């Protein structure tokens, strides 16, 4: 069976595991998480990210919160004269925006983990960099296009590959917005 969930925002990993257990989620099933497992609550989703590293039947699709974290990965660089010189007003603005969107709790959890296991933080950042922006899947005989937010400024006939990354993570669609018949998608 295929499962889809989104916007966990720091939901405790223990509760997510309990939810999956109640749904009888097993190794023959597949879970898509439509972004935003991090920020705002608890450990900032770091527990979920660590769990994701070892889950072959779970795929995180990049959300805007993961994208904001990746835009702040300069925080995990070694501190050198060059990195200090490169810390400019643009980076301060990027960090400030992320903090305003609930990123503090995630940054604090990752900073703590970085002291204990910098390799794990590097693995998490690598994992996030490799997350897809979307997936086309078939479940129950129906085709679905999965992404975090819809498709910003959608145009019928436009190839999916012609949209910028932000189109899949920053859109604010209405519930009744229709995009396309999946059989007509040109990826």
Where are these regions (language model features)?
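Short glycine-/acidic-enriched loop or helix-start segments at secondary-structure transitions
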Residues: 42-44, 70-72, 156-157
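Divalent metal-coordination and catalytic microenvironments
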Residues: 7, 36, 63-64, 106, ...
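N-terminal active-site segment of His-dependent metallophosphoesterases
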Residues: 1-49, 186
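Short amphipathic alpha-helical segments and helix-helix/interface helices
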Residues: 49-53, 125
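A general structural motif
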Residues: 1, 26-28, 55-57, 141-142, ...
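A basic- and aromatic-enriched beta-loop-alpha substructure that forms the phosphate/nucleotide-
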Residues: 58-115
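Short, solvent-exposed loop/turn segments at secondary-structure junctions
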Residues: 9-10, 39, 66-67, 150-154
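Acidic, His/Gly-enriched loop-helix segments that form or flank divalent-metal centers
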Residues: 100-185
């Amino acid at each position: 069976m295929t499962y889809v969930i989104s916007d966990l925002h720091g939901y405790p990993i223990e509760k997510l595991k309990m939810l999956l257990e109640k749904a009888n989620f097993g190794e023959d099933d597949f879970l898509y998480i439509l972004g935003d497992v991090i920020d705002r609550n608890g450990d900032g989703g770091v527990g979920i990210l660590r769990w994701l590293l070892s889950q072959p039947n779970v795929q995180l699709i990049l959300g805007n919160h993961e994208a904001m974290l990746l835009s702040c990965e300069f925080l995990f660089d070694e501190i050198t004269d060059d990195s200090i010189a490169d810390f400019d007003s643009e980076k301060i603005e990027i960090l400030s925006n992320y903090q305003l969107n609930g990123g503090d709790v995630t940054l604090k959890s990752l900073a703590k983990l970085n002291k204990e296991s910098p390799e794990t933080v590097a693995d998490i950042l690598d994992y996030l960099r490799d997350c897809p922006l979307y997936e086309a899947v078939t479940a129950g005989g129906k085709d679905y296009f999965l992404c975090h937010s819809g498709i910003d400024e959608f145009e019928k006939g436009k190839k999916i590959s012609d949209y910028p990354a932000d189109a899949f993570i920053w859109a604010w669609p209405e519930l009744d917005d229709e995009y396309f018949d999946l059989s007509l998608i040109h990826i």
